[in-house]
Amino acid sequence: MSRPKLEVADIFRRHGAAWRTANKAHLSLGQRRVMTAIEVCRTAALGGHVERCEECAHTRIAYNSCRNRHCPKCQWPAAAAWLAAREAELLPVPYFHIVFTLPAPISAIAYHNKPSVYGLLFAAAAETLTTIAADCKHLGADIGVTAVLHSWGQNLQHHPHVHCIVPGGGISPDGKRWIACRPGFFLPVRVLSRLFRRLFLQGLEAMHAVGELQFFTDLATLKDAHEFRAYLAPLRTTEWVVYAKKPFAGPKQVLAYLARYTHRVAIANSRLLDLDQIHVSFRWKDYRESGCHKSKVMRLDVGEFMAFPAPRAAERFPPHSPLRPLRQHLSRRQAGALSKPTRCALCPDGSP
């Protein structure tokens, strides 16, 4: 695979040291480690190793990778290992994809309270799905959920949302049988949206009551309980975005989807377009456009771009998974191998 003409590492090497000096009072140790890891990834600073093709004996020297979870060049091996573990949890049933998104006013609070609010986002989304699924009016079953947090959008703006992968059914209340949902339909989105709104706001108010939330700059007045309630008041009646995408065809499609999302970094090197002394330009898709997603170009200040590294905790976990007792009763369909070794370009047959 050819090297992109511009990489995140190039931007960090060129502007990182000056930016860290200018922002040293605001940078966490984790952010510094992420930037340093990306800067030295696959350079002599990390040493190297010799790779030898078993077919033609061609050898080459390769520099070692940083293996940091936020590095655009190091995520496939980590994703493969994570997916291998998740493969054992999949069932031979259709899977659904449901997205829970926080409104912009809540995102503003989340920006300075990431561990607390992101944890609440996971918990509220999981409780919403399991509560509605357990209701006999809808499914009447105990379901499993795998959730993945994204704290940014395609344009690198703060946009917390959780992607939930849910099997199309669950275990009966007595734990003895599988209850399947209707073909092509899992749970009503409007019902999910309203319960999610209520659970999240209740949790946020509880955090505020015990002083768990911090407020700065334009939101500093929200430290006052009355101001906080007034800030949340309009959000109690607006529709929160809960989006149900088309169901997956089966476990293979679930794995293919998870491969793109579980270890996703803020921006892939392939999306970068240009860099100068002041700005970085990159491609992004505007998912608010109806029909096909419109590709656009975003131009950010270099300093704003370099602030992208995600939080080091509360990124992804399966919040609710009661399916293990049932797996022994269900036939398993094995997913294909995650990856195969690739021959070098000098082999007579370069294909795997």
Residue ranges of model-derived segments:
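Beta->alpha loop/short-helix hinge microenvironment recognizer with preference
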Residues: M1-P352
